[in-house]
């Protein structure tokens, strides 16, 4: 079996594989899904409204190992997701990033930078880390409610649907 064939199967303990298998729930449910890609909210704790994750529907750890069809489908998914997020939240900027250090399954963070926040991805990441740390210490100021997550997911889902149909 080749490395790529082995990565087509879910990997036990992989957060993304667990979500795709329905073993972990995303707040607000599936926002968008096609043959290759899945869009949903980040899993708990959610401290950043509109923080989405685009993940490949099979386990794969390197962009170089995407099939031509997966690679071709990625651009449109990222584009419509960013457009929908921008339409719903009106952020100053929408960032797309992929690190793969903690969760190696190919995934992309979609992070809206709110108006008034200093420009630069480093400020967004610092703000995100501080919010998560304080939430884990019991400060619930930034915790996004289930109702807000469901409402936001519905609005983003609707915007993506309109863009994919039109």
Map each language-model feature to its residues.
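HIT superfamily nucleotide-processing domains
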Residues: 1-166
